[in-house]
Amino acid sequence: MNLIQQLEQEEIARLNKEIPEFAPGDTVVVSVRVVEGTRSRLQAYEGVVIARRNRGLNSNFIVRKISSGEGVERTFQLYSPTVEKIEVKRRGDVRRAKLYYLRGLTGKAARIKEKLPARKG
């Protein structure tokens, strides 16, 4: 492990951020700290994770949602101080790591099948 990787690992440990397990296809609610003038508030951004890039401290993910009939995508840094918390609403069952094809789909075609828990027995 080189020096930069070691420093990144120490920084991640210092941040002590609670990050749930999530993958592309999952529907998540990202609580973002928004500062307006002197006031600060939390804004919830709910959508489908279409990509995740794991690069240590520089990890990020893209969340896509439909707002007023228009597709909106937002990229979040995983360890950013503006990202307050990430909550997984539902697990999606997909076979791709990057779901960029959802950009061209609308309505029912853009739905993602829900991943059901494994049956025991």
Swiss-Prot record:
Key word Cytoplasm present: no
SUPFAM superfamilies xref list: Translation proteins SH3-like domain (SSF50104)
GO biological process: translation
Key word Ribosomal protein present: yes
Domain of life: Bacteria
InterPro entries: Ribosomal_bL19 (IPR001857), Ribosomal_bL19_CS (IPR018257), Ribosomal_bL19_sf (IPR038657), Translation_prot_SH3-like_sf (IPR008991)
Cellular component GO terms, alphabetical: cytosolic large ribosomal subunit
Alphabetized UniProt keyword annotations: Ribonucleoprotein, Ribosomal protein
Sample GO molecular function, one term: structural constituent of ribosome
Protein family (similarity comment): Belongs to the bacterial ribosomal protein bL19 family.
HAMAP family associated with the record: Ribosomal_bL19
Role of this protein: This protein is located at the 30S-50S ribosomal subunit interface and may play a role in the structure and function of the aminoacyl-tRNA binding site.
Other known facts: Present in outer membrane vesicle formulations which are used as vaccines in human.
Protein name: Large ribosomal subunit protein bL19
Naturally occurring in which organism (per UniProt): Neisseria meningitidis serogroup B (strain ATCC BAA-335 / MC58)
